Amino acid sequence: MDVRQSIHGAHAKTLDTQGLRNEFLVEKVFVADEYTMVYSHIDRIIVGGIMPITKTVSVGGEVGKQLGVSYFLERRELGVINIGGAGTITVDGQCYEIGHRDALYVGKGAKEVVFASIDTATPAKFYYNCAPAHTTYPTKKVTPDEVSPVTLGDNLTSNRRTINKYFVPDVLETCQLSMGLTELAPGNLWNTMPCHTHERRMEVYFYFNMDDDACVFHMMGQPQETRHIVMHNEQAVISPSWSIHSGVGTKAYTFIWGMVGENQVFNDMDHVGVKDLR
């Protein structure tokens, strides 16, 4: 488990390129037949990926020991979105078929979660966010047909994009975790511009669906002290509450956003005008 400490905005603005990457970038999300796990002290979110190929991958008691509990989800809830081939997730003996861009919410208290791919030639790639939970909500599969896509932006400003809200109050109940998937239209490059912060929750972006020769310049930092981190395919970045989170790519891309904190209202944002950025 890779543990990342909280960091003050006044400290973050003093960091060089490598310092910013060390604090905020999750460089390797998927490893064959393993799970990756980054634990952030910011709202205690856990971020990672699971890519089973030749065997199943379990997340259970061995992780619980690192969290001071008996098993991984004893006091946590889990959200998973599959960006790869078809797979299965078995939760305490109940098997769910999770296809490409299907998602599964797993409620607090599940003792064993087992991940598998159906075809080793096209393995599943399960990206997940995990957050502390105070009560148990039912485990539920969510498919792309069950979300309500919202298209925002304009081709003229190169930010036309479709937002798919998977884990939000209108779709299912969670304790605090919200997740969704945003896809840029072909030829569009910007996400979340004009940008915002949100004082009441943090966020993690996971960029994917990118060519090897493409990248995203992820904008971060306090609005008057902006910095950037260069992101490549299937990498994630941690965004504290005080930081903007926006990006511009060399080509169109897709990203998964995950938020935890004290408010699940999607539009609870502190907007920042483009003219006010520095």
UniProtKB/Swiss-Prot annotation:
Its EC number is 5.3.1.17. One of its GO terms (biological process) is D-galacturonate catabolic process. This is 4-deoxy-L-threo-5-hexosulose-uronate ketol-isomerase. Pathway: Glycan metabolism; pectin degradation; 2-dehydro-3-deoxy-D-gluconate from pectin: step 4/5. Its cofactor is Zn(2+). It comes from Shigella flexneri. Belongs to the KduI family. InterPro entries: KduI (IPR007045), KduI/IolB_isomerase (IPR021120), KduI_N (IPR027449), RmlC-like_jellyroll (IPR014710), RmlC_Cupin_sf (IPR011051).
